[in-house]
Amino acid sequence: SKWEIGREEFYKQCYEFCMTNASNAREQEKNIGLSADYSREFFTLDPRLTKTVYETFEMMFKQGLVYRDKRIVNVCPNCKTALADIDTQHEERRGIFAYIKYPVVGSKDKYIMVATTRPETMLGDSAVAVNPKDERYLEFIGKKVLLPIQNKEIPVIADESVDMEMGTGAVKVTPAHSPIDFELGKKHNLEIVNVINEEGKMTGDIPKKYKGLDTISCSKQLCEDLDKLGLLEEIQNIKHEVAVCERCLTPVEPIISNQWYLNVNQLAKKALDSLKSGETKVIPKGQQRALEFFYENIQPWCISRQLWWGQRIPVWYSGGKKVYDWLNENEGKTVKDFETEF
């Protein structure tokens, strides 16, 4: 594996492979009818391109368009890297819908039933949320339930975003492992509890028997344990859409992590204003609202990766260097000479 041979040797082998097979790639492109001006050919990691990338990064950094932030992001446990939303795709996979009882604290024989496709994440639950208009749960709002297995009291909160028709109308809230729950957690100031790491293994402050298990194994074990406790109502076998890595098709894990982001919201505003003013026209016109919705709901774009091959982010975390120092001090060098971690 690349971890066994190390970064430098891995880069060397990738570089040699690219150089050896470049001519084959050109011939294949010509064979399929590609017409290109090969006098303008550039290798991805050509020093000239690297310089342009870093100059652009510097410019955007100074403008506040790129920044480092700790927020929830897609992580591929197999590739071991963060991914942007566009780097994932959705596939139909077999799964389960587990109906779990959360006992109401101080109320004998009363509980709130929660339906979830990911029982393993319940170990990191911070609340149970219900719709304030849902008469079934009005008496429980503001009270607490006992989080099964963890034996921890968590609040019952009210939020209008909860779909009363979905599942049981009550949802578990796991801010550390769901983008929707992350935003809900910020809104209600909920605790963030990480229970899954970047390798897709169970971790954190959880019972020892679950630590180190992959998420699927943990889900099965939890359901067995909940059943023994009389807290598992039923399990339905379902088919549902799962976000997977576009490279290896491994299901991604939403995990809170420090990454670098592009503030596309600021850029999207200009495009949105252009649409609404009529400066930009959409054909067919009926699709304009869909494009406006996309711009209105766009999220920060994660641009950092934990991969060893590609342009590297020109940022130091020690030594006092600034982002732009590399450009002046290392002009003409290849990217493999640039030593930084991100």
Regions found by a protein language model. Name each.
Residues 1-111, 166, 170-326:
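Residue patterns forming the tRNA-binding/recognition surfaces of aminoacyl-tRNA synthetases
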Residues 41-42, 136-139, 209, 260, ...:
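Intrinsic disorder/low-structure terminal segments
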Residues 108-173, 177-183:
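Protease-associated
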Residues 141-144, 231-237, 340:
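Short secondary-structure junctions
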Residues 320-342:
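Glycine-rich (often Gly-Gly/Gly-Pro-rich) flexible segments and glycine-rich loop motifs
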